[in-house]
Each structure stands twice: as C-alpha cells, then as structure tokens.
C-alpha cells in the first residue's frame, strides 16, 4: 500500500472511523492540515479501540494481523495491520536497515521476542527479508536459552545481532562468563529501549570488533517513526518520508516546534494505515530537532504517556489505576513515575503524595499512619505487578530493580515551571 495524501486520509478517517468522526466533529469539513487537528488522547483512543466493536477501525476486522502493544497482559491494547499495510511497514523499515550498516551477505541473528501477539521478532525478520540488500536471516529469538544461542551464533558465524539492549547485554554477560569468542560479530543492532553507556562498555568487552547502532525507531501502535542516521549519536533518526509525518510538540501548548535543540513530545501520523488510522498520535517519547539534516531528530527519552523500564513498557494510566484500586481510603492525592538507573539496571519508583495535613508524609518511622502507608505501598505494587506481569518477571530475571514506593508531600511533586502542571513521568536516567 502506498502512502496517501494527508487530506485524503483525514477525510477517510472522518467518514469511516466513529472515533475520528467524533474527535473531529467540531472541525470544518475542509480541515486538511495537521495543525487543524487535535492531538489524539491515548486514554480515549484505546478505550475506543476495544477488541470487539472497535470505534477506531474504519471497517470490519476481516483481513489483518493483530498485535499486542503495551508489552503485557491485563488491559491489552491491540494494533492491527492489513497485509498490504504490513508489507509497506516492513519494506520501508527494511530500507532503513542499510543505514545501520547492513551489507550484502550479512548473517543476521534476530534476537527479538516472539509469541503472545508481540510483533518485534516478526517485524525485524520481515524487515530483513524486505531489505534492499541480500542477507542471511537467523530466526533465533530472544527467549531461546543462551546456552544454545551462543553455539548457534558461533556455528553459523553470525555477523549481526539484533535485539533489545537487555537481551544483547545478557548475551554479552554469558559470552564473557563462558569464555567463548564470537569473533565474527561486527554489528549490534538495538531497539525497543535506550542503550546506556554502561551497557555499551559491556557490549564492547564481549564483542570488541562490533559497533552498536540503532536498528531504527518504530512501534507496533505508532508505526514508522525514525530511520537511523549514520553517525556517532545513535539517538539521531530521520522521518520515514513519505510514509509518516513526525512532529515535535511543545509540552505546554502543543504547538509544533521547528527550531533545533528545543525538546518536546513526539507525535506521529501514519500515511499508509487506513484500517486503524494513526493521526497525530503521541508516540510516548520526547525528542528535539538536531538541525543536521532534513527531518533529523534526537530521541531524548520517554514522554508522559508511557515509560520504558528495561524491557517493560508501562503507561501512566496503569499506575493510576493501580493506585485507585489499592487506595480505598483515598490517602494518595498525587503521583509521579520516577525512572532511575543504578548498578547497570533500570528501576521504577512510584512517588506518591499523601493528603494535605499529613505532615509525616515523607517518613515511615512507626505508628499507625506509617503502617497504613507501608500496607498501601505493598498493595499498590501488587496491583501494578498484576496488570504488568512482565515487570516482576523482569525483576526475577535480573533485568530491572523491583518496584518501590517513595512518599512525598504534594508540594514536593515536580511540576512544569511554565504551567504549574504536574509532571507525570520523571526520567532521571542519563540520556546518552
């Protein structure tokens, strides 16, 4: 399926999708520019896109592949692609793989995850199959035991390893522990989460002849986001023109940012998806234009709509729902998600503010109030782990630190200095 004109896509979505029809109800009939349109609210979007009787889809779900987005069970979010849309998706992404350093004849191990409606393994495998250069694909998967993965990589002389940073680092640790040398590996393609400096050092030790680069920037819900830009900064990508339009919007006003170096949130419009239109959809990341080339931008981390902790994706709504379910007494009046990185792993802290007048909000030094807060903290963590079971699974696997709760007074919660609005997610990890 080829990309379509934006104005045609808007008209089609308005006419055939009940969700977009309602969203654009107050707009003039000829609204045909992105700036004419509101930004999609993720909560209402996914509430409307139920597995049955979706109000987002423009037609019946009779020919498509269904994928799950959000990374877990609980309240699953489903993203659908027709066969033509998927072909366009993987062909465009496959073209971008050349920018990563993929060369003719490269033997590429796909170490992303498969099954349970997850897309990453199939997506990378299909993108490699549609790449404009010949390559040899090794569909190993991220769930295969490292004890068998390493001999397979050695015996088949794999030259490129593609996977999440977490998977690549676990492999690197096993390589170093076993003393095996995978001398043929020359390229490490990472995706799905940020690659930090401590991880780069580990990968360089295990694979001294390999360079780590971004495999590209995409998601199963938002679609095509960024094609890799060769260079020293793996965070820099460029838009997949003409298949998608990337905007960077001001955090306070939602006005498009045009000048380099000014951070904002990433919003994407897919020009090739018609069954499940994606128009001004928040990708969940923050970025800034670099000014180094047309459409070049640097990814800066996750935005408020979502957060990535190691291999786990969470939405702020997940944490809010967990607090609402556990806090039957209404003790919590504010919440922030704080993502930190220490000892080589990511960790998520739930910063909870108690009701005004609780002068001991930041203390847990005994007494009935402290006991109630401790019990509430355990209940909130249990609720969130139930909704996002991949998190405790990742804790047990050693990928991330356990969830924790940090108590605060409401005035201690970080706010936007320009608007006074609460900042839902604080990403305190290094950006490079």
Regions found by a protein language model. Give the residues of each.
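Active-site phosphate/ATP/adenylate-binding loop shared across adenylate-forming ligases
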Residues: 46-187, 194-202, 206-207, 229
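Conserved AMP-binding/adenylate-forming
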Residues: 195, 201-292, 304-305
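Generic structural signal for residues in well-ordered beta-strands
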Residues: 135-137, 212-213, 246, 335, ...
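A short, hydrophobic beta-strand element of the alpha/beta-hydrolase
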Residues: 189-190, 216
């Amino acid at each position: 399926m080829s990309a379509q004109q934006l104005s045609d896509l808007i008209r089609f979505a308005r006419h055939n999708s009940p969700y977009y029809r309602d969203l654009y109800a107050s707009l003039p009939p000829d609204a045909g520019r992105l700036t004419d349109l509101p930004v999609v609210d993720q909560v209402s979007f996914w509430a409307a896109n139920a597995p049955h009787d979706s109000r987002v889809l423009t037609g019946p779900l009779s020919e498509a592949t269904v994928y799950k987005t959000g990374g877990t069970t609980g309240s699953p979010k489903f993203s659908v692609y027709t066969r033509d849309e998927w072909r366009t998706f993987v062909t465009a992404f496959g073209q971008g793989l050349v920018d990563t350093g993929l060369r003719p004849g490269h033997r590429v191990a796909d170490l992303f995850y498969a099954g349970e409606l997850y897309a990453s393994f199939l997506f990378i495998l299909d993108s490699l199959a549609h790449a404009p250069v010949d390559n040899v694909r090794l569909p190993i998967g991220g769930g295969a035991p490292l004890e068998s993965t390493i001999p397979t990589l050695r015996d088949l002389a794999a030259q490129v390893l593609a996977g999440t940073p977490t998977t690549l680092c676990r492999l690197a640790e096993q390589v170093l522990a076993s003393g095996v040398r995978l001398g043929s590996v020359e390229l490490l393609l990472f995706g799905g989460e940020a690659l930090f400096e401590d991880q780069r050092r580990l990968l360089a030790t295990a694979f001294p002849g390999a360079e780590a680069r971004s495999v590209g920037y995409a998601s199963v819900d938002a679609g095509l986001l960024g094609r890799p830009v060769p260079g020293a900064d793996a965070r820099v990508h460029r838009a997949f023109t003409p298949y998608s339009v990337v905007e960077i919007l001001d955090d306070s006003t939602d006005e498009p940012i045009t000048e380099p170096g000014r951070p904002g949130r990433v919003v994407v419009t897919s020009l090739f998806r018609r069954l499940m239109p994606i128009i001004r959809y928040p990708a969940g990341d923050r970025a800034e234009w670099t000014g180094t080339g047309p459409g070049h931008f640097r990814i800066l981390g996750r935005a408020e709509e979502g957060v990535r902790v190691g291999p786990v994706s969470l939405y702020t709504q997940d944490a809010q729902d967990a607090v609402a379910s556990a806090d039957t007494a209404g003790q919590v009046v504010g919440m922030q998600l704080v993502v930190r990185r220490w000892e080589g792993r990511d960790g998520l802290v739930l910063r909870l503010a108690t009701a005004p007048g609780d002068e001991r909000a930041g203390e847990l030094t005994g007494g009935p109030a402290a006991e109630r807060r401790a019990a509430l903290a355990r209940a909130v963590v249990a609720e969130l782990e139930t909704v996002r079971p991949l998190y405790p699974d990742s804790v047990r696997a050693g990928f991330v630190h356990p969830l924790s709760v940090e108590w605060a007074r409401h005035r201690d919660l970080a706010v936007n200095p320009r608007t006074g609005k609460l900042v839902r997610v604080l990403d305190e990890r290094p950006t490079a």
